[in-house]
Amino acid sequence: MTRVALTSAVNLAKKLSDAGIRNQAVLKAISQTPREMFLDNALAHKAYENTALPIGQGQTISQPYIVARMTELLLSNMPKKVLEVGTGSGYQAAILAQLVPELCTIERIKGLQIQARQRLKRLDLHNVSFKYGDGWQGWSNRSPFDAIMVTAAAATVPEALLSQLVDGGVLVLPVGENTQQLMRITRHRERFSSENIETVKFVPLVNGELA
């Protein structure tokens, strides 16, 4: 990172701390990650604003507060193996890869997946496995997972993802069609408990693959 980018990332982490993010490991990862790398050059000057930004193909890079909040929720059971559904720009994956030993991430849009893979390689993050495919179905041959994060809004909770959690595993996702609820769902053997965390706004989780 350049000195200017590092200063901007550190300042962003301070703003997120003031906004209520308490996990110091999450804040450290935010402060060390060059968000401008995950944006087109035309939007790089907005990289450290606490706002969602377009990345093409009708997708967005999430607001940094939401990235930090979802990561904080995901880490509640100290997961070792995590699945991310919706790689997008790769920014959320870059944060997670600094915090968990093993990350698997799925993206249905091929162009975004290729770009994200290149970005994480440039950041020397090598504990990440990438898949081009339908996130609704999860990644069954790499399951079970200690935690799963979905970075797009599902109209209903995907059953396939619930089935791929370990006992005690956590699923963090937005649920709803317009304004959504960010939820944390915990598996207790064959039953599940859920918590509504806060109101959020995400692009929809879409079935299938897109070249």
From Swiss-Prot:
It is found in: Cytoplasm. The keyword Cytoplasm applies. Coiled coil: none annotated. It comes from Shewanella sp. (strain W3-18-1). One of its GO terms (cellular component) is cytoplasm. Transmembrane segments: none annotated. This is Protein-L-isoaspartate O-methyltransferase. It comes from the Bacteria. Catalyzes the methyl esterification of L-isoaspartyl residues in peptides and proteins that result from spontaneous decomposition of normal L-aspartyl and L-asparaginyl residues. It plays a role in the repair and/or degradation of damaged proteins. PANTHER family: PROTEIN-L-ISOASPARTATE O-METHYLTRANSFERASE, PROTEIN-L-ISOASPARTATE(D-ASPARTATE) O-METHYLTRANSFERASE. HAMAP family: PIMT. The lineage of its organism: Bacteria, Pseudomonadati, Pseudomonadota, Gammaproteobacteria, Alteromonadales. It is an enzyme of class 2 (transferase).
